């Protein structure tokens, strides 16, 4: 439920500032594009303002005229104050004022202002904006419903605006969303009271009425799909970072439950064939070099939606129909079967596609598709069957098919690690094609903040959980400044994209070999600096050729891998120091006098090195002092993995030695921890205007699978206030009731 306190806003210097900034940056948008933009024009209701609004609504032609046909009124200028010198709303004189730089004056923004708003100015009007994700963008009606809800929330009661209560009405509200397939902005403007205006703005800044387009329905289908892909990929791509995003003025809604008209997951599945061939236009995850029809953000989103909703049958029918003309689409179905625990079906389909090579022969990117199938096979053998010898052969074939792709090389190196073939693992890792310039999908600020005092970040008071919502950001900042610099400056924590994955492999290797032996392996297979300098100097004519042979057999270590060795050394050094200190403190029965932020950093360091129990203990120590969202998320991840480990052990041959009561007690303990952590993270997300989290849905589904929805709801009800239960019900539990086609027991 959206309230005044759940809407972050940025105050504009002049009406239309954010829209103008977005328009001039349209050519710079890449792949999935930016978050949606919502702009509002608010005013304090007076008799003159009411008359002006009513007059404008009667003259509808002035409102809905084509944006390109409107000419800016350069003489318009006004300054209004809402009774507080620090809260001054300025409609800038377009001929004199400049924004941020002398090269760009406010006259640039005048056309946009005139296009989206009537020329009559209201007294005491304020322009604000915020970003949004997850809104149903399937058509102008669904967007208008959302905008109307926002305007009613703002107007229903006095708003606490920069410390003062003010009764605002909304005169105009607009919504801009990026159609990633056509690289254009779709704009919907609602005039209150009045009409709805919707049009396209292309990368050249030219506007066109959508209703005049011959492919009207296709444009809205693409816009809807673009919005859903952005919402899902924002969470999935940043899962390792805890789904964090730094654009604080963003309202993130659940795209599955925010549908105003139709069922969003089902609509996405049904529309998928329409945009299938355009999927590569959206881009692909950071580890993919060659973007294909089956390896892109569109496909990743479909797989994630089916995994969450368990609507496998609908997706299977759709993909098999699609595969009639596009046989490679079966690869997507195989991915869905694998993530939805239908492994036998996935294996059979994979075998059929590889054995009937003619299916792949008739498609473009044949080797890429074959490599993708082989990678799926290898991943399955590594994770599920632990058949590393067979996985090694398959991964090698995948490398031969796509030598420029990172994933086949990564899987091959991982297999060698599992086989304890360290030399080959390092050689293959050194050969991995890295993508240093490709980043994960993150939100970026389109309209710069006009000033430090322009952010309006209300505290959601509808849900209060003291240990979470009462956390003082200033105290956290003080902790960050006081933390151990050696911990804070560990560079491995800043690794991105494929380097993050490569470092993970290196830590797996060092767990097997130890640091000293790893250095020996390194010197055996890579040319060390001293050897290189010696070989580059002039050699005597009578040098023994046999002495040159060992050096010739060695490889040059890539600079990025050399750097990872250094980062690994720093992590190991810090981990050893902390472990030694903890052992000493435990022996002395002394308390560990550490900050929560320091426990968090140490936990992350231990986690990077693969010491998961030690990492979990550090996160628990941090949470015992105050709430930390990162500690909570990483501890939640540990609880899920530990729960799965216990379940796997029960099904293993050695499980007969374990007492069933002990196993049940451990599972129950982990379930309680998972529920508590999910609730607290949900409250924290709500505090920062985020009502959607894939990781929380994933984690809670594990518990609901065993306990049922009703029991989980009762557990939350018995431990937390009703407002907290209602929040969790709305943001998490309702999803399992309405979007999972009855896969979870009520």
UniProtKB/Swiss-Prot annotation:
Gene Ontology cellular component terms for the protein in this record: exomer complex; membrane; trans-Golgi network transport vesicle
What InterPro entries is this protein classified in? ChAPs, TPR-like_helical_dom_sf
Q: Where are the transmembrane segments?
A: none
Which superkingdom?
A: Eukaryota
Subunit organization: Component of the CHS5/6 complex composed of the 4 CHAPS proteins BCH1, BCH2v, BUD7, and CHS6 as well as at least CHS5 and GTP-bound ARF1. The complex interacts with the cargo protein CHS3.
| Similarity remark | Belongs to the CHAPS family.
- What does this chain do? Member of the CHS5-ARF1P-binding proteins (CHAPS) which mediates export of specific cargo proteins, including chitin synthase CHS3. May be involved in positioning the proximal bud pole signal.
UniProt name for this protein = Bud site selection protein 7
Gene name?
A: BUD7
């Amino acid at each position: 439920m959206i309230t005044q306190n759940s809407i972050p806003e940025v105050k504009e210097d002049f009406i239309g500032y954010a829209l103008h900034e977005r328009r001039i940056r349209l050519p710079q948008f890449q792949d999935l594009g930016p978050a949606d933009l919502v702009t509002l024009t608010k005013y304090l209701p007076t008799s003159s303002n009411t008359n002006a609004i009513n007059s404008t609504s009667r003259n509808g032609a002035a409102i809905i005229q084509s944006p390109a046909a409107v000419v800016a009124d350069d003489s318009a200028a006004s300054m209004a104050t809402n009774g507080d010198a620090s809260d001054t709303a300025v409609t800038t004189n377009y001929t004199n004022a400049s924004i941020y730089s002398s090269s760009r004056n406010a006259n640039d923004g005048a056309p946009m202002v005139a296009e989206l708003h009537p020329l009559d100015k209201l007294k005491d009007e304020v322009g604000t904006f915020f970003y949004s994700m997850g809104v149903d963008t399937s058509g102008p009606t669904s967007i208008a419903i959302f905008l109307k809800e926002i305007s009613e929330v703002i107007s229903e009661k006095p708003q606490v605006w920069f410390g003062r209560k003010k009764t605002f009405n909304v005169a105009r509200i607009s919504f801009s969303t990026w159609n990633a397939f056509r690289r254009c902005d779709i704009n919907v403007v609602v005039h209150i009271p009045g009409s709805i205006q919707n049009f396209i703005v292309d990368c050249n800044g030219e506007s066109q009425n959508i209703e005049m387009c011959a492919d009207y329905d296709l444009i809205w289908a693409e816009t809807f799909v673009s919005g859903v892909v952005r919402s899902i990929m924002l969470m999935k791509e940043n899962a390792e970072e805890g789904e964090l995003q730094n654009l604080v003025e963003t309202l993130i809604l659940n795209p599955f439950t925010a549908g105003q008209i139709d069922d969003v997951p089902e609509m996405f599945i049904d529309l998928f064939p329409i945009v299938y061939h355009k999927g590569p236009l959206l881009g692909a995850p950071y580890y993919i070099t060659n973007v294909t029809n089956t390896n892109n953000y569109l496909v990743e989103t479909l797989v994630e939606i089916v995994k969450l909703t368990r609507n496998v049958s609908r997706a299977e029918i759709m993909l098999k129909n699609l595969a009639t003309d596009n046989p490679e689409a079966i690869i997507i179905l195989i991915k869905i079967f694998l993530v939805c625990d239908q492994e036998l079906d996935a294996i059979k389909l994979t075998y059929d596609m590889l054995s009937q090579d003619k299916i792949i022969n008739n498609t473009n990117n044949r080797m890429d598709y074959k490599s993708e199938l082989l990678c799926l096979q290898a991943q399955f053998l590594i994770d599920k069957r632990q058949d590393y010898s067979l996985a090694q052969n398959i991964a090698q074939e995948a490398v031969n098919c796509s030598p420029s792709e990172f994933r086949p090389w990564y899987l091959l190196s991982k297999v060698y690690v599992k086989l304890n073939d360290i030399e080959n693992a390092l050689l293959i890792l050194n050969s991995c094609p890295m993508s240093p310039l490709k980043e994960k999908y993150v939100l970026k600020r389109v309209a710069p903040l006009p000033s430090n005092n322009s952010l309006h970040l209300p505290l959601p008071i509808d849900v209060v959980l003291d240990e979470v919502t009462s956390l003082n950001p200033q105290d956290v900042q003080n902790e960050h400044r006081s933390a151990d610099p050696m911990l804070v400056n560990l560079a491995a924590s800043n690794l991105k994209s494929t380097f993050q994955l490569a470092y993970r492999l290196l830590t797996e290797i060092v767990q097997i070999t130890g640091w000293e032996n790893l250095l020996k392996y390194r010197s055996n297979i890579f040319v060390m600096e001293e050897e290189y300098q010696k070989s580059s100097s002039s050699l005597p004519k009578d040098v023994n050729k046999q002495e040159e042979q060992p050096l010739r057999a060695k490889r040059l270590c890539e600079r990025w891998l050399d750097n990872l060795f250094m980062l690994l050394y720093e992590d190991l050094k810090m981990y050893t120091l902390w472990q030694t200190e903890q052992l000493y403190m435990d022996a002395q029965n002394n308390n560990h006098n550490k900050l929560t932020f320091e426990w968090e950093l140490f936990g992350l360091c231990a986690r990077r090195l693969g010491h998961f129990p030690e990492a979990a203990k550090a996160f628990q120590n941090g949470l015992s002092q105050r709430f930390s969202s990162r500690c909570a998320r990483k501890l939640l991840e540990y609880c899920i993995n530990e729960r799965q480990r216990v379940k796997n052990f029960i099904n293993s041959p050695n499980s007969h030695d374990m007492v069933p009561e002990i196993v049940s007690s451990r599972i129950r303990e982990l379930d309680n921890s998972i529920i508590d952590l999910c609730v607290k993270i949900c409250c924290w997300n709500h505090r920062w205007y985020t009502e959607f989290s894939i990781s929380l849905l994933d984690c809670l589904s594990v518990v609901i699978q065993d306990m049922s929805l009703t029991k989980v709801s009762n557990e939350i009800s018995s431990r937390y206030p009703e407002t907290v239960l209602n929040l969790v019900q709305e943001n998490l539990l309702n999803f399992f009731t309405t979007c999972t086609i009855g896969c979870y027991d009520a």
